[in-house]
Amino acid sequence: MEAAKKQSVTNQLLAVKSASGKTFSQLAAETGLTNVYVAQLLRRQAQLKPDTVPKLKEALPALTDELIGDMMSPPWRSYDPNLIQEPTIYRLNEAVMHFGESIKEIINEDFGDGIMSAIDFYCSVDKIKGVDGNNRVVVTLDGKYLSHSEQRTENMVSRLNLKGGTSE
């Protein structure tokens, strides 16, 4: 989806949400999705799956079949590079940069040499009260652990296929 069409569809989707008067968290509760995933769907950063269509249409009855069709196509998962200048996004990036090395070391200690997937991944934003009574933001990043593999030629399927003459 080209950038202009993506922006047009996104604007229409966000207008439907705005007209509904519902928050991302309310829509999440109605659809069984996380609030961040609902926001990603409406911003065309995630693909709407067929099983979710009825729940989303029930939560947002003003969604047209054309918009649903757009949401079901694979999204162009890009972002505006100027987005980093938005204060909330800047602070999230700053937090990851500040705590990143420590988080990585703890992942390595607890799991081994690997990474947290951003594909098999869940994210949510929650509001809680701190011990001081002030509102606190909880951002949960829940990703599958993926270990780095030792690159042994005996396990390299493309090499095995080349040697064996098969191309399946």
UniProtKB/Swiss-Prot annotation:
GO terms for cellular component: cytosol. GO terms for molecular function: cyanate hydratase activity; DNA binding; identical protein binding. It catalyses: cyanate + hydrogencarbonate + 3 H(+) = NH4(+) + 2 CO2. One of its GO terms (biological process) is response to salt stress. Pfam families: Cyanate_lyase (PF02560). Gene3D superfamilies: Cyanate lyase, C-terminal domain, lambda repressor-like DNA-binding domains. InterPro entries: Cyanase, Cyanate_lyase_C, Cyanate_lyase_C_sf, Lambda_DNA-bd_dom_sf. The active site is at R91, E94, S117. The keyword Lyase applies. The keyword Cell inner membrane does not apply. It is an enzyme of class 4 (lyase). Its EC number is 4.2.1.104. Keywords: Lyase. Catalyzes the reaction of cyanate with bicarbonate to produce ammonia and carbon dioxide. Belongs to the cyanase family. HAMAP family: Cyanate_hydrat. This is Cyanate hydratase. The gene is CYN.
